[in-house]
Amino acid sequence: MEEKSSGGGVRLHVGGLGESVGRDDLLKIFSPMGTVDAVEFVRTKGRSFAYIDFSPSSTNSLTKLFSTYNGCVWKGGRLRLEKAKEHYLARLKREWEAASSTSDNTIKAPSDSPPATHLNIFFPRLRKVKPMPLSGTGKHKYSFQRVPVSSSLPRSFCDCEEHSNSSLTPREIHLHDLEAVNVGRQEAEVNVMNSVMNKLFEKNNVDPEEDNEIEADQDNLIINVASSGNDMDSALDMLSRKRKSILNKKTPSEEGYSEGRKGNLTHPSKNRQTISLEETGRQESSQAIRGKKKPSEVVPDKSSDEPSRTKDLEQSIDNISWSQKSSWKSLMANGNSNDFSVSSFLPGVGSSKAVQPAPRNTDLAGLPSRENLKKKTKRKRVTSTIMAEDLPVSDDIKRDDSDTMADDIERDDSDAVEYYTACESMADDTASDSVAERDDSDAVEDDTAIDSMADDPASDSVAESDDGDAVENDTAIDSMADDTVSNSMAESDDGDNVEDDTAIDSMCDDTANDDVGSDDSGSLADTVSDTSVEAVPLEFVANTEGDSVDGKSNVEKHENVAEDLNAEKESLVVKENVVDEEEAGKGPLKASNKSTGGSSWLQKASWTQLVSDKNTSSFSITQLFPDLTSDKGEAAGVINNVGNQFSNSNQTASAMKQTDYASSSGGFVAAGVPVDSTPVRSLDENRQRLNGKNVSEGAKLGAKKKIIKRKVGSGDTCTFMRSSTSLKEWAKAKKALSEPRRKKNSEE
């Protein structure tokens, strides 16, 4: 049921109605409190309620109604009174009425809008529109200078005097910029200038229409400046045309000035290299004069430009050549010529510019020469030299002792060569010339020494150099010709009279190149000519003999090599026998310990050389174990016979001139000694006597070192021999190992 009053009725919801309640029952209850306009029942699906449009008679009547009937049991139901919403149809009517009434009243915008105080600007990066205040910020805003803004809006957002004025047009801005150039010029000055220019134009009969042209003097300075804004466009056009005409016109004086500048434009680094100090001073003074004078007064100096440039180039070449060290001159100059000229290598330099040799430097007189340095190093070690006929020139010897000989030579001469190299790098051109002269004099001395030895091989060859240095050669001929070999050997051991053997080295080089025809001997002689050759000790003799026996397949290729090898062996054995004769009381092995090669020769000997006797020609195992069978002795004899045949078959005359060869019983050949001479007979007798002693000593040594063989009798037993007990134990162990496997098989 619903009740509504015209005077502001209220829609009420009455729930909990009984089935027997009707319209009249509700009117009896609500009519004393107010007026009931409409009642609507809703009875669906067990529900029973009503909407009543009620208009209360007083403000307290509605409250009294709720307090009286809300929650009351009436006709089988409990009443519930509540306020309900407005009916939707009534709401629509009201809205339609309100819309129809307001359609005639249109809102009109006011005619005068208030002035805008902000400018809304969209910032893409911020993605929002921000209002920018048009005034009152107190700061200069130059963020949007290039944006064309209408005249109604200000150009800048500032209240200062500069920006408070009205915005200017682009033409006015251009005129304002031109007037800013004329800072400090007043109108009176401009008027004076205009009057002066007008008088000048009248004298020159210039039309008054050309008064606005801009004149330029020789310094290209603008005198007339237009200050009026009306004729500014024409003035700018005239100015551009005038500048083009000035740039296109060039006077002869300006062309000469430009050519002079082109001739003098060079890089500062090039001037430092090619221009001398005097000419740089001249150019600086001329450039200063050009800076002070006008371009028309400068006269280019073309005549002196090119000759001075070529002259500076030649002087720079001379300076570069003199700035180098003296070592390259000594390398480039010929060894026989004392004068060196740059014109032979630099064709651009004339003969007058050739480099003259410097005077001999007297400061280098105190420096030690190569000969003196070698003498000092030779006195430190005890050496004995051999003749050129005894030099080994074969590849076999070169392979056997190349490492040891190179180590000895480099170790002995390294200090002298380094010191001499340091002195040579400090020397001037004179030092290189003096070295060349010294080398030539050494070569002459070597040739003289060779000739003297060829004439008298049994005499001592002494060569005197230009400096007065005496070269004394201790050769094998001296030791065999005289009985005073022991005295000379003792003196060489003390290190008092050992002289430089550079002449022997060069002599070996010359004789080997002239007399020996094979390539191998020539290459070895060239190598030996730069360094001193030491005598090979006795261990080396034995080693070379063994190598010659092993190298049986190379007999046809190296016949000359074997002959020279045998000659060297014989000479060394003769020397060692003489030493043993002089020192017989000291034991047969003491002379071999005094070998001149140093301790490195002893360390590099084979076991056959260490075990064998020093004076015997070959080594045999029978010397130590005489109980061996005769088969081994026969094999050793066959080896010795092969060595004898190998040494005797090489009888070609390719080793040295004016030398005689004789085969010895031990397979050695003595070179350069007459067979029928008295010293050779005495040496043969001494050799036989010493060989007898050595054989007896070898027999004693072999008897001492006899091998004791142990014979095991039949009664002796070994713990590891097979026996019945060992077989039984082996069977038990085998059975014990196989039992677990049998158990496994039975279980499966």
Swiss-Prot record:
Result of knocking out the encoding gene: DNA hypermethylation (at CpG, CpNpG and CpNpN sites, N is A, T or C) leading to increased siRNA-mediated transcriptional gene silencing (TGS). Narrow and slightly lobed second and third pairs of true leaves. Disrupted ROS1 subcellular localization in the nucleolus.
GO molecular function (one): RNA binding
Keywords: Nucleus, RNA-binding, RNA-mediated gene silencing
Bias (Basic residues): 373-382
UniProt biased composition (Polar residues): 266-288, 520-531
GO CC terms, sorted: nucleolus; nucleoplasm; nucleus
Residue stretches of biased makeup (Basic and acidic residues): 294-314
Domain RRM, residue spans: 10-86
Superkingdom of the organism of origin: Eukaryota
Region described as Disordered: 244-318, 350-531, 579-600, 729-748
Any one biological process term the GO annotation gives: regulatory ncRNA-mediated gene silencing
InterPro entries membership: NOP8_RRM, Nucleotide-bd_a/b_plait_sf, RBD_domain_sf, RRM_dom
Tissue expression as described in the entry: Ubiquitously expressed.
SUPFAM superfamilies assigned to the protein according to its UniProt record, in alphabetical order: RNA-binding domain, RBD
CDD domains in the cross-refs: RRM_NOL8
Coiled coil: none
Localization: Nucleus; Nucleus, Nucleolus; Nucleus, Nucleoplasm
PANTHER family linked to this entry: GERM CELL NUCLEAR ACIDIC PROTEIN (PTHR23099:SF0), TRANSCRIPTIONAL REGULATOR (PTHR23099)
Domain remark in the UniProt entry: The RRM domain is required for single stranded RNA binding.
Entry function: RNA-binding protein required for DNA demethylation and to eluviate siRNA-mediated transcriptional gene silencing (TGS), probably by guiding ROS1. Can bind specifically single stranded G-rich RNAs of 21-, 24- or 26-nt corresponding to promoter sequence of target genes; this interaction directs demethylation of target sequences.
Protein name (database record): Protein REPRESSOR OF SILENCING 3
Name of the gene this protein is made from: ROS3
